[in-house]
Amino acid sequence: MTQAQTQFADRNLDCTQRGWGITPIIGVDYRTGKWNFGARYEFTTKFNIENNTKVDDTGMFQDGVNTHNDLPGILAFGAQYEVTKTLRAMASYHYFFDKDARMDRNKQRALSGNTQEYLAGMEWDVLPAVTVSAGGQRTKYGLGDGGYLSDMSFVTSSYSVGFGAKISIAKNAKLNIAYFWTHYEHFKKSYDQTIAAAGQSVDVHNTDDFTRTNKVLGVGLDIDF
């Protein structure tokens, strides 16, 4: 296999990562008339993960190595308004302290800003035993020039829409069904690279285009004992 073929060959990885952390959470809730307001703050979770690696052709996941993988702190605000006895509207805002969360190789320093989320939705009690809902979410990431991203794992700013239903199937049981769709924006990351081919070094300019779409269907059962 030539040097160029080696650089572009597939890589195999079999690695399990484990870790634990504690997250203190402070929250407040206030109700007045038809309004309900809430806020919470989740502290940054100091979190290390350890590699248990069986196969690693990438050279990035050495067995037994611990790496930082903190969960960022979150500041969230929300409000709900009772339009009628059966119709409710709500909105919320989330701010993630990504740049304060330690990551492998300190890649959080490549972010240009912290993540922000904007959410809004409606709930409607169609029948005493049936509630339907719909909502949307806008997520904005501060990705800077893209140095934070890699094809191993990535996120880009996104739009999401979702629909759901809650059905009472017994006095102490409720069936929940939900579907949501997320479209991630295109983000182009440009960089220069030197490739060895036929005994020579070739300088190339690359552009990686990151995007994806998620479609999720969820079903759950709530039981009160």
Regions found by a protein language model. Give the residues of each.
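Outer-membrane beta-barrel porins/channels
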Residues: M1-F225
